[in-house]
């Protein structure tokens, strides 16, 4: 769920507030359209698509689904006791948090004009 995703981001990118990722580019945060502005925004586009796929599992609501995971020294592990929905959502969040850690953060792409740049 989004609370756990926030904590995963804190695990892999401890130097930044998770809020820095909540309104970034065309895909980080609510919605998503157009061409991603950079690699970090592409991480969010992939995460959005991953949630859409997880949502196809019967009764699976990715934004609200809790799962079991652990963070150890910046390494995320989804636990084996997750059901198929929880395992899918956990993996979406884990992969996105890892992607965030490897992508440069461009302050110019925070809080951009979505109508102008995300067609």
Curated annotation (Swiss-Prot):
Record note on cofactor: Binds 1 Ca(2+) ion.
UniProt KW keywords: Calcium, Disulfide bond, Hydrolase, Lipid degradation, Lipid metabolism, Metal-binding, Secreted
Binding site for Ca(2+): 27, 29, 31, 48
Organism lineage string: Eukaryota, Metazoa, Chordata, Craniata, Vertebrata
Name recorded for this polypeptide: Acidic phospholipase A2 E
GO terms assigned for molecular function: calcium ion binding; calcium-dependent phospholipase A2 activity; phospholipid binding
Coiled coil stretches, renumbered: none
UniProt key word DNA repair: no
Active site per database record: 47, 93
GO cellular component, one term: extracellular region
Keyword Nucleotide-binding carried by entry: no
Tissue: Expressed by the venom gland.
Cystines in this chain: 11-71, 26-118, 28-44, 43-99, 50-92, 60-85, 78-90
UniProt EC number: 3.1.1.4
Record InterPro entries: PLipase_A2, PLipase_A2_Asp_AS, PLipase_A2_dom, PLipase_A2_dom_sf, PLipase_A2_His_AS
Location within or outside the cell: Secreted
Cited function: PLA2 catalyzes the calcium-dependent hydrolysis of the 2-acyl groups in 3-sn-phosphoglycerides.
Catalytic activity: a 1,2-diacyl-sn-glycero-3-phosphocholine + H2O = a 1-acyl-sn-glycero-3-phosphocholine + a fatty acid + H(+)
Cofactor: Ca(2+)
Family label: Belongs to the phospholipase A2 family. Group I subfamily. D49 sub-subfamily.
GO biological process: arachidonate secretion; lipid catabolic process; phospholipid metabolic process
Pfam families: Phospholip_A2_1
């Amino acid at each position: 769920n989004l609370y756990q995703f926030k904590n995963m981001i804190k695990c892999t990118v401890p130097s930044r507030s998770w809020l820095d990722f909540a309104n970034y580019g065309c895909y980080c945060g609510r919605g998503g359209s157009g061409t991603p502005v950079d690699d970090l925004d592409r991480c969010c586009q992939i995460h959005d698509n991953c949630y859409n796929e997880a949502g196809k599992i019967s009764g699976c609501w990715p934004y609200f689904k809790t799962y079991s995971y652990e963070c150890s020294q910046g390494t995320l592990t989804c636990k084996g006791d997750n059901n198929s929905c929880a395992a899918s959502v956990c993996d979406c969040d884990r992969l996105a948090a890892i992607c965030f850690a490897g992508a440069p953060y461009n302050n110019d792409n925070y809080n951009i004009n979505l109508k102008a740049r995300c067609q």
